[in-house]
Structures are given as structure tokens and as C-alpha cells.
Amino acid sequence: MAIQFVTKESLSRIDESTGQVSRDGTKTALLLLPYDIGFIAGYNDLYVAEKVAVKTYGAMVMCRTGTFVGIVGYLDSPPLGNTIIDIEKSGPGIAGTSIFSTKPQFTQTNNLTAGVLSTTTFASGNQIRFKVTTLGNVSQPGSGMRVILKCKV
């Protein structure tokens, strides 16, 4: 088994296009690393799938500056009609606004149709909220939703 030694200095994030050098002058850190964020909806307290509802299911504060790359999702039970989700970004001086110009949706299938990103950047301190915004059919909106917001930092 390989063991890698990691130090604080070797994790310094350097953009070489600026002419900066690493602390020890030899190592540079990787940039644009994956920073995927998972959200769930439509589960009870025992993680048994249940119908999704129109509400906010998760919120977090971003701790790094980065970019939104895309979104993927899956429902254990597909909806009848279109169940639409949204991710809103807010922060100092920014009201909660969607990061999508076309919101992602489950269109009578288990897999999420990705939507179109209109906001692609976030900063440390920005808040994001994951919501189910529209149910195509209240009696069969889908259940057991898992969504991953793909980001890079």
C-alpha cells in the first residue's frame, strides 16, 4: 500500500499563470479539483423513500471559491408529470436567486434532465439552497430523490 505524505505547504493552491511560486519553490497544487455536493429529498428519518414535497431540503455555506459545472440526479420512483428542482445562491448583497436559466426536472423518468446554468461561479461565504419547486402530480410526485451538484474549486 502506498502512503503519501501531505503537508500544509504542499496543499497551497497556486495559480502558476500569475508568476507566484509555492512555499518551498518546487511543488504546486492542483487547481480545478472536483467539489461535488450531494442533496437528498423524499426520505423519512429512517431513510425510507417517501413522496417529495415543494420545500427546501438542504442549505449550506460554500467554503471555497469555485464554479458550478452541472447537476445529476435520480429518483427511486419517477413522477407522473414534471417534478422541478432548483438551487439558489445568495450571499452578502445577493438575494437568493436560481443558478439556472432553465431549471432541472424529472420528466416522468428516474433520471434528472440537467437544466441550463445561468450562474457558474460562487465565492467563499455564498449560501446555496436545494429546493423542490414544482410537482407535476401531487399524488405521484416521485420519491427517494438524490441530486449531486457538480462543482470545481
Q: What do these predicted ranges mean?
A:
Residues 73-126:
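Terminal beta-strand-rich extracellular "head" domains
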Residues 18-20, 43, 66, 124-130:
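Glycine-centered small-residue hotspots that permit tight backbone geometry or close packing
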Residues 27-85, 137-153:
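Beta-sheet-rich sandwich/jelly-roll-like modules and their strand-loop junctions
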Residues 1-19, 152-153:
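Short, intrinsically disordered N-terminal pre-domain segments
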Residues 130-138:
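Short beta-strand-plus-loop segments that form exposed binding edges in beta-rich domains
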Residues 11, 20, 32, 40-41, ...:
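Short linear motifs centered on Gly/Pro in flexible linkers and helix caps
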